[in-house]
Amino acid sequence: MARTILVADDNRGFTDLLRATLEEAGYEVVTASTGLAAVECMRRHDVGLAILDVLMPGISGDAVAERLLQVDPTLPVLLMTGSSGDFAVGSGLPVLRKPFPQEELVAAVRRLVPPA
């Protein structure tokens, strides 16, 4: 399985923090700041995990997840949300509630994409 992770979030500072955390944990990371850019990244890169913010400009993270899973139903997807609502939970996909400790992110990623 590819160890490249797609991180999609419209908050650039947060995306940079996640990239640094995941690279330190040994993963390659590509980023996108919109849902449409996330879909395009998936076309260009061999991604083994998609980490998607639920609320992004254009296409929402849960809609992106739905599109990606139509193409590859085995793709691990992890949603992130700062919302207190449970709308993302209904998707059946794992959800990290922002803010979350970096250790929680790495643990969730390792459950979905075990280290090589």
Q: Each PLM stretch: what is its role?
A:
Residues G13-E24:
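Charged docking surfaces used in two-component/phosphorelay signaling
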Residues T31-L49:
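Acidic, metal-coordinating helix/loop segments flanking the phosphotransfer/catalytic sites
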Residues M80-T81:
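Hydrophobic/aromatic residues positioned on beta-strands within the core alpha/beta folds
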Residues D9, D53:
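Active-site residues of response regulator receiver
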Residues S33-A37, I59-V64:
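Acidic catalytic/metal-coordinating carboxylates
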Residues M56:
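Receiver (REC) domain active-site loop signature in two-component systems and cognate sites
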Residues E40, D62-T74:
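Short amphipathic alpha-helix used as the core "switch/output" element in two-component signaling
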